[in-house]
Amino acid sequence: MKTVSGKKLCGILQAKGWRSIRVHGSHHIFTKEDRDERICVPVHGNSDLKIGLQKAIMKIADIKDDDIY
């Protein structure tokens, strides 16, 4: 699995229909109208997310490995 930065994952989430509802410090909060979950993505410059956090976010958002470009 390719790791990505928080910035890039935010772009992928928006492309999948998630919208940013607010930013608290360096954490971007996303929601989707047909879902009850919220996703918090840390954006710390261009550093990659740790693999466990990235997998958890991808699982909630139904993002496949092929969607990471």
Which residues make up each language-model segment?
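Gly/Ser/Thr-rich beta-alpha loop segments that engage phosphate groups in nucleotides
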Residues: 8, 27, 54
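N-terminal first-folded block
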Residues: 1-24
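Active-site beta-strand termini and strand-to-loop segments that position acidic
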Residues: 30-34
